[in-house]
Amino acid sequence: MTARLALLASLLLLLQLVPPSSAVVLELHGNVYPIGHFFITMNIGDPAKSYFLDIDTGSTLTWLQCDAPCTNCNIVPHVLYKPTPKKLVTCADSLCTDLYTDLGKPKRCGSQKQCDYVIQYVDSSSMGVLVIDRFSLSASNGTNPTTIAFGCGYDQGKKNRNVPIPVDSILGLSRGKVTLLSQLKSQGVITKHVLGHCISSKGGGFLFFGDAQVPTSGVTWTPMNREHKYYSPGHGTLHFDSNSKAISAAPMAVIFDSGATYTYFAAQPYQATLSVVKSTLNSECKFLTEVTEKDRALTVCWKGKDKIVTIDEVKKCFRSLSLEFADGDKKATLEIPPEHYLIISQEGHVCLGILDGSKEHLSLAGTNLIGGITMLDQMVIYDSERSLLGWVNYQCDRIPRSESAITSRL
């Protein structure tokens, strides 16, 4: 009896010593094709209004299009966010300083002393002002943040702005001081600067903040570059087929970017990949012939004798790719099976979901982006606490419930 009481006392003491970690789990909507976005529904403002935010680990600032009024704005699903003067963040506010630190620019403020900004993206730009408002976000510890700073974008310098898009704007999830994740941690909503996403090939998936959902085993981990503002495992070597030699002339600088629908390789690894894929098709699957796709984003496609419905119909014609990251004597391999780089178009063609970054995005300058298509059916974890990037095969169409780390450990 005395021994049992002692054991119980020890367990209670352990619970007091282990800091409670909380988790936020959010359902994802969308798909790689044809929607081209994975997004969450976020309720913002008081009273709250719903917005679709594209999850983007390649962007720092979360922002909405704003009726301030809005110039050159895109056609989006919901009514534009309308700020009030009380919501504006001033130039003197530390949040404004943090924003410009994240952007890597000297702080410049307009005559009204509000925190103005301009963000340049690969294919567009956004001009706006920093605001604060309520985000209705529930966590496993019951905490609900009062205010979150985000961008109020009132001028979008983007082509084809008259074309409707399926999302209202961006949920910035990269490393930085004004990211949503950093603000949630500073408010005590989560205790660890950890996030992850799980994108399902069936569509949808989930996003989580905090470390409570991270599996205790089976994850392939590799160090992240501590100095990089993006989530980069450094340089990786590209292989075609499991037993082949490297097809990249040199290790490739890699960034994991959930905001990129497709995967983008620099010119040399892209041409090498295209060459070996075509060579395999010419020798083993001559019934597939190259064709021009109506969707201009899909630059390399093949058609069969009949309309192709699923990747399984042509999977035997393609080989797996892999990226190998070295950390001393340790190696971490990201397997890229055909279903993680191929797309079946609406025309019934099979298309390469790896694009030439040197042509599509001229500013990439040799960087290779691992986009959503290559992260399908895997839990991808960005652990800034330990500077580790991890991935593990996962059934992403099953959304876990939010629970505290203490519960998951016992």
Curated annotation (Swiss-Prot):
Residues 1-23 form the signal peptide. One of its GO terms (biological process) is proteolysis. SUPFAM superfamilies: Acid proteases. Residues 24-46 form a propeptide. The gene is ASP1. The lineage of its organism: Eukaryota, Viridiplantae, Streptophyta, Embryophyta, Tracheophyta. It comes from Oryza sativa subsp. japonica. Belongs to the peptidase A1 family. InterPro entries: Aspartic_peptidase_A1, Aspartic_peptidase_AS, PEPTIDASE_A1, Peptidase_aspartic_dom_sf, TAXi_C, TAXi_N. This is Aspartic proteinase Asp1. The active site is at residues 56, 257. It is an enzyme of class 3 (hydrolase). GO terms for molecular function: aspartic-type endopeptidase activity. Its EC number is 3.4.23.-. Keywords: Aspartyl protease, Hydrolase, Protease, Repeat, Signal. Pfam families: TAXi_C, TAXi_N.
